[in-house]
Design a protein with these regions (language model features):
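Conserved donor-binding loop and adjoining core beta-sheet/short helix segment
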Residues: 34-128
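Alpha-helical elements of Rossmann-like donor-binding domains used by nucleotide-donor carbohydrate transfer enzymes
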Residues: 13-16, 89, 93, 207, ...
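Conserved active-site alpha-helix within GNAT-family acetyltransferase domains
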Residues: 113-150
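Acyltransferase donor/substrate-recognition loop-hinge adjacent to the catalytic core
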Residues: 1-9, 56, 136-221
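Hydrophobic, Leu/Ile/Phe/Ala-enriched alpha-helical segments that form helix-helix packing faces
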Residues: 18-21, 94-98, 140, 190, ...
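N-terminal charged segments
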Residues: 6-51, 58
Length: 221
């Protein structure tokens, strides 16, 4: 039987774990933790240790209001959900931790892909990640979690994400060539019109917010 232990991690240790985890993402970093702490949310960095090594982790949030207290793990926890023993231990510990905090419920948003598809929406072969992660979903259900279902449309948590495979692409020319003809035309047209990309400074964030709002109103979302 494997020996696990729940530990509290430093922000630095958590960032290091997240940076090397297959499902690591911005929501599971100390930067996101500082942002949420600034909003008055209680933040903790929890991890599972096995044989001296951190094998799972979570930026654990406790939200408190006059009406209720609840716990959230955005885009996590970071865990190998196909490892049933590890998943059962970590989720059980997190549920107990949430209960000790007085939470009425705990919401998690695992970042692990359920099933990989090609650019046309078809499922990839099983050896390329196309096999649905039904076992992982069932493990979480058996632990008391309720799955929100495979929704579509603009939701707070997008069910579908598109990632560009950059394997074999070494420069801008080969990247452009990897897209279809219509996309190539759009990119070349934007370049001919003087459109370019640059990083905004913090003093320009309102410009981004205004553009985002205008786009939302124009696109009706």
């Amino acid at each position: 039987m494997r020996a696990f232990s729940l530990v509290t991690l430093s922000p630095e240790a958590f960032d290091d774990f997240s940076a090397h985890h297959a499902d690591g993402n911005f929501q599971q970093t100390s930067a996101a933790g500082r942002l949420r702490a600034g909003q008055g949310i209680e933040v903790e960095y929890l991890g599972v240790q096995e044989n001296g090594t951190i094998v799972a982790g979570a930026l654990f949030e406790t939200h408190r209001s006059r009406l209720s207290t609840f716990s959230v793990v955005h885009d996590g926890p970071l865990c190998d959900y196909r490892d049933r023993e590890l998943t059962e231990y970590f989720m059980t510990q997190l549920k107990q931790h949430a209960k000790a905090k007085g939470s009425a419920q705990m919401e998690i948003v695992p970042e692990m892909p359920y099933c990989l598809h090609d650019s046309r929406g078809g499922e990839l072969p099983a050896d390329q990640g196309g096999a649905p992660a039904d076992d992982a979903v069932e493990t979480l259900k058996n632990l008391g979690f309720m799955h929100d279902g495979f929704t579509i449309g603009y939701t707070a948590v997008p069910r579908w994400r598109y990632l560009k495979d950059l394997t074999g692409i070494t420069d801008e020319k080969s990247l452009l060539k990897s897209y279809d003809k219509r996309t190539q035309w759009s990119v070349k047209r934007a370049a001919s019109m003087g459109v370019h990309v640059r990083e905004l400074g913090e003093d320009e964030l309102q410009v981004f917010a205004d553009i985002e709002q205008a786009t939302a109103e124009r696109r009706n979302f």
